[in-house]
A protein has these predicted regions:
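A short beta-strand-loop-beta hairpin characteristic of the jelly-roll/cupin
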Residues: 119-143
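A short glycine-rich, His/Asp/Glu-containing loop-to-beta-strand
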Residues: 80-100
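Intrinsic-disorder/low-complexity, polar/charged segments enriched in Ser/Thr/Lys/Arg/Asp/Glu/Gln
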Residues: 2-4, 111-113, 168
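Short beta-strand His + acidic residue motifs that chelate non-heme Fe in jelly-roll/DSBH
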Residues: 104-106, 124-126, 141, 149-163, ...
Length: 174
């Protein structure tokens, strides 16, 4: 079974990285980051902190669902990021950075996720499984501008065993 599917959606990776680097350099401050590795592109109507309340586990959201995080943050208006969010009709979109030599705990998400890799290294990969090694899928998602649909409703983790960090745009399907 394929837990990770390359879609037909492809976007201009150079433009995305140009916009991301400008936003990161000129607009984002330390306060816009959750644990220095996540920042939100969307917020809910009740957010006090529009850039961090949708980060981390959805359990942190105080009863809100992923669908509640549907409003685009101002600094992303008019960007290719907004175009992608609108075209895919996704919610709770975040930039997630996996620092070098890190791994997430195995967990299950409530909804599937779309991933668009902004930058990566060859030693990063998802591991998804049905609790047996025979049914596991291990995959590196390249920085090729394509959207990849990942069934994160199955037990999974992400590993960055490389020397460089990787940056993904992660979007939820509510």
């Amino acid at each position: 079974m394929k837990y990770i599917q390359k879609t037909n959606y492809q976007f201009d990776l150079d433009q995305l990285n140009f916009e991301w680097n400008n936003i990161k350099e000129f607009y984002l401050t330390k306060d816009h980051w959750y644990q220095e590795v996540q920042t939100c592109l969307q917020h809910s109507e009740t957010c006090v902190d529009k850039y961090t309340e949708g980060c981390g586990s959805i359990k942190r959201a105080g009863g809100r669902t992923e669908r509640d995080f549907c409003l685009i943050n101002d600094i992303y208006r008019g960007t290719l990021f907004e175009t992608i969010i609108n075209e895919l009709n996704v919610v709770r979109s975040r930039i997630m950075i996996s620092k070098r030599h890190t791994v997430y705990s195995i967990h299950i998400d409530r909804t599937k996720r779309s991933h668009l890799v902004l930058n990566t290294n060859p030693d990063t990969f998802f591991i998804l499984s049905e609790n047996t090694i025979e049914k596991s899928e291990i995959m590196h998602i390249p920085a090729d501008g394509y959207i990849y649909m990942v069934d994160t409703t199955k037990p999974h983790t992400f590993v960055n065993a490389g020397e460089e960090s990787r940056t993904h745009l992660v979007m939820c399907h509510g």
